[in-house]
Amino acid sequence: MRALPFEVLTGDGTRLRGESWPGGPDWVVMAHDFGGDLDCWRPLVGPLGAAGYSVAAIDLRGHGASEGEPATASIPVDLAALLAQARRDTSGLLVVVAAGTVAAAALSPDLLPRPDALVLFSPRLQEGVETNLRGDGTTKLFFVGAADPEADRTVVDLRNRSIGHAGVISFPTATQGADLLQEPWRSHVIEQVVGFVDHARAMSASPTREGGTG
């Protein structure tokens, strides 16, 4: 897949830069954790594209080629801008893939527009980032390195408090976040992500789903 420049203008005027790989009408958009950049998601790009999805990844403000300074308070603003841009580009399925503190922010029901599904790598709760699962039934898939007790407890708690489907895939390692896309876990993680997104696409196209939205 050939990468194209992808830009998002946030509500406070900050320009976020990234890359997109256009494909089918359904989109998977990806946001890294603090201290990273969009390169962490490259292992997913080819497999998702081969499955017929359009893919986009951004650098958060203050990271990579994006403008601004990194700040926890800016995470919801950046995520909302990314989702709004994706919704302008498609009326199809919209899936968010995120890691760490950004993954936790994606759980807020106040984040609009809402995605159809969430793939969350080691969500990390942090002061100033709201996570309120009781108001949101978005289907979710969590990844976590279970050898880190705090990370494992966080994911189990989030899964238990979730409304709607919430699956957890854990690995016997302290590795967390998008680093789980490295060996030896890479192929299994990729398979699970693509399978989950395929399932979300099938559910979004079902007559029950279509009838329930009218």
Residue positions per predicted region:
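Alpha/beta-hydrolase active-site loop
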Residues: C40, P70-D89
